[in-house]
């Protein structure tokens, strides 16, 4: 179950939300959890500099039916971003985020982006930022089928992107992106040698360099599609190995089809991953969403995840036959009211 209330007034916006889930397994056990949170942000224009600043807070709680103590966690962040026009063709973004997660501490994450117009409907950009990802509460405190790791730390590191984007026509958009990342304490899934159960651990180092290419096309007022591909070389060092080892996947393909007619819209998205480690089979994940505008203020949306109900391994296979699977086909019905 999910509920959200959002308020917007000119340059200020705020929201409160709640989410409740019940994960059932192929045994007699299941996992329950809920999240509640809020965020607020505002925009200002001081001279020629645009400033966006805000804060957010979230409380997470989870418990399973096998006697594990319930786990709960608070997290929050404050952030700002400035936007400055430098000359007629250059725009600079400069910002930072101070993020805090209980059990993981806090990290200061700066960001710098430069956007340069190099021609009609064509630009290049440079983006450098530091990121932080705290472990999911279930990754740290376990589930009915997974060991807990209270010492699991948040991962953090630097990300670098150099991109090019060109609007070929009013209906065609082409993007090229080259990226590199260096992550400390990267969170990954492994198998415990004693119990045979899965457990999440921290890798000492993680690095990944790759390229992404995407194309978007509007066929008509009703139909559109997008295509994308990626090639990367993700590697990590663990506590048990001082050598760089392959991880995750090398090749990725994605595609989407969109339809829009009057008050109705529909989209199907597909992601395919191959070139994986340990003989893990390719993964195909297809999601769909449908939307209907009931009135000018009311919208009904249906989202279906894992449309084909595949049980492909999503992440963390140490043998090629085990790991975190795609969730079973599930759906979310959303009603939105503007007032």
Where are the regions a protein language model picked out?
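Outer-membrane beta-barrel signature, preferentially recognizing the C-terminal barrel domain
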Residues: 1-8, 117, 123, 127-184, ...
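Face-selective signature of the C-terminal outer-membrane beta-barrel domain
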Residues: 1-117, 172-178, 218, 224-228
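Conserved C-terminal beta-signal and adjacent last beta-strands/turns
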Residues: 82, 126, 246-339
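Transmembrane beta-strands of outer-membrane beta-barrel pores
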Residues: 9-11, 18-22, 46-48, 57-63, ...
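Residues on the lipid-exposed face of transmembrane beta-strands in outer-membrane beta-barrel proteins
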Residues: 3-9, 38-44, 80-84, 112-116, ...
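Gram-negative outer-membrane beta-barrel transporters
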Residues: 85-92, 179-182, 201-277, 296, ...
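Transmembrane beta-barrel architecture of outer-membrane proteins
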Residues: 1-4, 33-41, 73-79, 93, ...
């Amino acid at each position: 179950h999910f509920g959200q209330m959002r308020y917007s007034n000119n340059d200020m916006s705020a929201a409160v939300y709640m989410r409740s889930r019940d994960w059932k397994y192929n045994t007699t056990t299941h996992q329950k959890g809920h999240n509640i949170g809020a965020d607020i942000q505002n925009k200002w224009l001081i001279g020629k500099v645009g400033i966006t600043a805000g804060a957010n807070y979230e409380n997470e709680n989870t418990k399973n039916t096998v006697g594990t103590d319930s786990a709960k966690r608070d997290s929050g962040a404050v952030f700002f971003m400035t936007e400055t026009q430098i000359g007629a063709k250059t725009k600079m973004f400069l910002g930072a985020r101070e993020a805090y997660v209980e059990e993981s501490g806090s990290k200061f994450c700066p960001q710098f982006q430069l956007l340069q117009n190099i021609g009609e409907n064509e630009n290049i950009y440079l983006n450098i930022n530091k990121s932080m990802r705290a472990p999911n509460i279930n990754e740290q405190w376990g589930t009915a089928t997974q060991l807990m790791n209270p010492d699991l730390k948040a991962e953090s590191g630097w990300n670098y992107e150099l991109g090019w984007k060109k609007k070929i026509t009013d209906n065609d958009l082409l993007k090229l992106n080259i990226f590199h990342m260096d992550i400390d304490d990267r969170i990954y899934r492994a198998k415990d040698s004693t119990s045979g159960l899965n457990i999440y651990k921290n890798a000492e180092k993680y690095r990944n360099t790759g390229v992404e290419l995407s194309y978007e096309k509007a066929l008509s007022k009703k139909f559109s599609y997008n295509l994308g591909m990626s090639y990367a070389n993700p590697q990590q060092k663990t506590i048990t190995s001082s050598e760089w080892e392959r991880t995750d996947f090398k090749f990725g393909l994605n595609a989407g089809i969109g339809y829009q007619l009057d008050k109705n819209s529909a989209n199907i998205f597909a992601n395919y991953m191959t070139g994986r480690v340990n003989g893990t089979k390719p993964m195909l994940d297809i999601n769909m969403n449908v939307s209907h505008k009931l009135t000018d203020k009311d919208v009904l949306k249906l989202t279906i995840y894992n449309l084909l109900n595949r049980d492909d391994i999503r992440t963390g296979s140490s043998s090629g036959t085990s790991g975190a699977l795609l969730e079973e086909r599930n759906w979310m019905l959303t009603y939105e009211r503007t007032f």
